[in-house]
Regions:
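Juxtamembrane C-terminal module of membrane proteins
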Residues: 28-52, 295-312, 328-420
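N-terminal signal-anchor transmembrane helix
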Residues: 29-84
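Acidic donor-binding segment of Leloir-type glycosyltransferases
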Residues: 73-122
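Long helical/loop segments within the catalytic core of UDP-sugar-dependent glycosyltransferases
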Residues: 109-111, 115-142, 155-239, 280-291
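Acidic donor-binding loop at a coil-to-helix junction in glycosyltransferase catalytic cores
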Residues: 239-245
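Catalytic donor-sugar/metal-binding loop of nucleotide-sugar-dependent glycosyltransferases
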Residues: 246-264
Length: 420
C-alpha cells in the first residue's frame, strides 16, 4: 500500500469536508430555529386588528375530486371577517368531478363569496403558475393567500398570517407551517412528517431568525397583491413557483417571514413511486430557480440573499455529490475493491456525522407538540439509512431532468401529485 494520497483519498477528503460543512451550517440553523421557537411561545396574535384587509384565497385545482371538498369547506370555516374574504378556486382543465363538487358547495353556501374559475386546455392547463395567474387576475383582495387543493387549514391560520404581515411594511409575504395529515398511514408518511418538521424548524425558522430570509412553500402563505402585479404574476416556466417568487420578492427589497402558529394540514404521498415523482419535480424546479438567480451572488445590491443561494446550491450540488460519492466509496471499500490511505479513525467521523443528524432532527421534533417521543427518535435513526438514501436518488434524478429539459427546450407542465 502506498503511503501517499491517491485519487480515492482526495475524493474521500472532499466528501468528508463537504458533509461536515453542511452539518455545521445546519447546526447553526437549528440553534437559530430553536431561538425563534422560544420567541413564538410568547407571541400573541389573537388581538383583533382595527381594520382587516381584504384577502383573496387562491386554490389551484386540477382533477382534485378526492380532496377539494374538504379543502374548500375548511376555507369557508376560516376565522376571518366574511365581508373581507373571497375564495377563488381555479378548476384548471379538470376531467373528473372537481367542478360538480365545487358547484354543490356553492349551492349549499349562498352567503359565501366562493368563485370558481373553470378553464380548459386552451385557457388553462399551463401548470400551477398559470392557474395562479388566472386566479389573481380575477381577484379583488389587497392580499393573496394560496392553499393547495389538498389542504385543511386550521381556523386561525389565515388570521395569524394577516396579523403578522400587518406589523411590518417591509414584509412582502408571510408563510405558515404545513403538517402531514396522513402521517400515521405508513412508514413513508411517518418519515415525511419528520422531514417536513425538520426542514421548517431548522431551515425556515433558522434562516428567518439569523438572516431574515425565508422561502415561500407551495401553500399556507399570503403575499401583497400589489407586489405580484409589479412582478407580472407567477413565472409559468417555473415548476417550483413558490421558490421562484420568493427570490423575486427578495429582489424588490422585501422580506418573507415564517409564522409557525399558522398551521395547515396536507396530504402527503403514500407510495414511494408518487413521492419520488413529486420530490424529483421539486428538485428540478429549485435548480431552475438557482440557475436563474445565481448572478445575484455577485451583486452588492442583493448580497443579503447570498446565503440562500449558497445554501441551496450546496444542498443540490456540493452535498448531493459528496453523499453519493461517499456511499460508493463505502460500498467499494467494504467489498475490498478499493483502498485509501488517509490516516485517522474515519469510522468515528461517520458515526459522529450520523449522531449529529439524529440530534438535529430530535431537536426539531422537540419543538412540535406530540412529536418528541421514543418512536419518532427511532424513526429518525432509521431514516438516515433508508429515506435519506432514497432522497439522493430523487435529487440526482431532478438535476438530470433539469439538464435534459433545458437542452431539449421542454416547457413546464402540470404534474399533479396523486391523491389518496
Amino acid at each position: 500500500m502506498s503511503n501517499g494520497l491517491g485519487f480515492v483519498d482526495y475524493l474521500f477528503l472532499y466528501c468528508m469536508i463537504s458533509i461536515w460543512v453542511m452539518l455545521f451550517v445546519n447546526i447553526v440553523l437549528m440553534i437559530g430555529g430553536y431561538l425563534y421557537y422560544l420567541k413564538t411561545l410568547k407571541m400573541n396574535l389573537d388581538e383583533p386588528l382595527q381594520e382587516y384587509p381584504t384577502v383573496s384565497v387562491l386554490v389551484p385545482a386540477h382533477n382534485e375530486e378526492k380532496v377539494i371538498g374538504q379543502t374548500v369547506n375548511a376555507l369557508i370555516a376560516l376565522d376571518y371577517p366574511r365581508d373581507k374574504l373571497e375564495i377563488i378556486v381555479i378548476n384548471d382543465n379538470s376531467s373528473d368531478r372537481t367542478g360538480e363538487i365545487l358547484a354543490e358547495i356553492q349551492r349549499k353556501n349562498p352567503g359565501v363569496n366562493l368563485i370558481v374559475l373553470t378553464t380548459d386546455k386552451i385557457t388553462g392547463g399551463k401548470g400551477k403558475s398559470g392557474a395562479l395567474n388566472n386566479g389573481y387576475l380575477r381577484s379583488t383582495g389587497e392580499l393573496l393567500a394560496v392553499y393547495d387543493a389538498d389542504n385543511t387549514p386550521e381556523r386561525n391560520a389565515l388570521k395569524y398570517l394577516v396579523h403578522t404581515l400587518s406589523r411590518d411594511d417591509k414584509l412582502g409575504a408571510v408563510i405558515g407551517k404545513f403538517r402531514t395529515r396522513n402521517k400515521t398511514k405508513n412508514m413513508l408518511t411517518k418519515f415525511i412528517n419528520i422531514e417536513t418538521l425538520g426542514f421548517q424548524w431548522m431551515v425556515q425558522a433558522g434562516r428567518w431568525q439569523l438572516f431574515n430570509l425565508c422561502t415561500i412553500p407551495g401553500t399556507n402563505f399570503i403575499v401583497r397583491k400589489k407586489l405580484i402585479e409589479e412582478m407580472g404574476g407567477w413565472d409559468t416556466k417555473a415548476i417550483a413557483e413558490d421558490t421562484e417568487i420568493s427570490f423575486r420578492l427578495y429582489r424588490l427589497g422585501y422580506k418573507i417571514q415564517y409564522m409557525p402558529l399558522s398551521v395547515t394540514w396536507e396530504q402527503e404521498p403514500e407510495t414511494v413511486k408518487v413521492w419520488m415523482k413529486q420530490r424529483s419535480r421539486w428538485v428540478k424546479g429549485n435548480v431552475y430557480v438557482l440557475v436563474k438567480n445565481f448572478k445575484l451572488m455577485f451583486s452588492k445590491e442583493f448580497r443579503h440573499v447570498r446565503f440562500d443561494l449558497l445554501y441551496f446550491s450546496s444542498v443540490y450540488f456540493l452535498f448531493l455529490s459528496s453523499a453519493i460519492i461517499s456511499d460508493v466509496i463505502f460500498i467499494l471499500g467494504a467489498c475490498n475493491l478499493i483502498t485509501y490511505n488517509i490516516a485517522g479513525n474515519t469510522v468515528l467521523l461517520w458515526i459522529l456525522a450520523y449522531l449529529v443528524f439524529v440530534l438535529e432532527m430530535a431537536i426539531a421534533l422537540s419543538m412540535e407538540k406530540g412529536e418528541s417521543n421514543a418512536k419518532n427518535i427511532g424513526l429518525v435513526a432509521l431514516m438516515y439509512f433508508t429515506y435519506c438514501q432514497l432522497w439522493l436518488i430523487v435529487a440526482l434524478k431532478g438535476v438530470w431532468q433539469y439538464i435534459k429539459d433545458s437542452v431539449l427546450g421542454l416547457e413546464a407542465k402540470w404534474y399533479k401529485t396523486e391523491r389518496f
